[in-house]
């Protein structure tokens, strides 16, 4: 159907060259740089198409079949697809796919299962936890009596004995298991036993490892936790958003009320469409193969870095991320993040357990393999990336402000590598 109204026919390039130009520059950046930020990934064209669909026009407050607006027949269809697919993916009885983010999903659980002033026990930020798990600057750290567990100073592994001791002493109403920067598997069964021993609810935030769990390469927290939250991006390779799972019908009712009307109004139906597509992709055998490559690539990258004299927190990784301790190289996280970006490699500065540096400086960086694996990198490519990272490290040791010649040479090699594995 032709439409003479330019409002509906003009492209972004025709209507807003400034925004279009910024998007094109971001596309070029993604095409020409190696993305090692562990929380980032690259979505499929199908997910992009779903997010750019006319569903962005639709208000759909409420839930499928129980909306507060008319005209929701097809919004219901899309949300029902997302719900059924994510339930199959994680073998869950109930799912809420409306949270706009992982933080919103976590907030909904706390609203549903805890009262202001209740004691909440989560992993400390400096040990690898997330802001929303009770860190002081976050809402969870302000509204609740938030206590933090950490890792062993000797092994850098999660200290389950400390979790148990804190739980026995303080009797939290909610225990949170999950992380933002922890490279090892979690023992969900032990967390549940600790929670049961003090009458607490167990929430697992699986945001970073949701894809690994979906592929069956990590224990499924749905089998142990009262409630599970996640983002839809990261290893799950979907749009930016969140969801909540539970097998408890009463908790499911509380979660639904906490998401809407408790925290949010209308759901973002175009994002939920993208979630449905990504969940469908994650149900395939191809996705399992992808996750196997993500894990193998993390091992390959870690092996090269360790061979080059770099310390990895806990000595390695069981998942998609590596936490690099830069102190043996005499380097800082912020310094390395900037140098690597100049060289065409993006990562993030990250505190390490018991870090003496400020969060804006840090003694470490966090690296991840999901995005590079999505574009087709295998172990050989990640070994090459590791070698180039080491070259930047060594140049920084000689020239702490940055070695332009080395960074530009590495950037050319990175660009050539990316050209072999194009995106979009």
Swiss-Prot record:
UniProt main location, coarse = cytoplasm
Q: Where does (6S)-5,6,7,8-tetrahydrofolate bind?
A: 125, 129-131, 250
One GO cellular component this record assigns the protein to is: cytosol
Q: Which Enzyme Commission number(s) are listed?
A: 2.1.2.1
Q: Which GO terms describe its biological process?
A: glycine biosynthetic process from serine; tetrahydrofolate interconversion
Keyword Transferase: yes or no?
yes
Report the superkingdom from the record: Bacteria
Keywords of the record, alphabetical order, are: Amino-acid biosynthesis, Cytoplasm, One-carbon metabolism, Pyridoxal phosphate, Transferase
**Pathway the protein takes part in:** One-carbon metabolism; tetrahydrofolate interconversion; Amino-acid biosynthesis; glycine biosynthesis; glycine from L-serine: step 1/1
Q: Where in the cell is it found?
A: Cytoplasm
Q: Which family does it belong to?
A: Belongs to the SHMT family.
Record's function text: Catalyzes the reversible interconversion of serine and glycine with tetrahydrofolate (THF) serving as the one-carbon carrier. This reaction serves as the major source of one-carbon groups required for the biosynthesis of purines, thymidylate, methionine, and other important biomolecules. Also exhibits THF-independent aldolase activity toward beta-hydroxyamino acids, producing glycine and aldehydes, via a retro-aldol mechanism.
Which protein, by its recorded name, is this? Serine hydroxymethyltransferase 2
Q: Which organism is it from?
A: Burkholderia mallei (strain ATCC 23344)
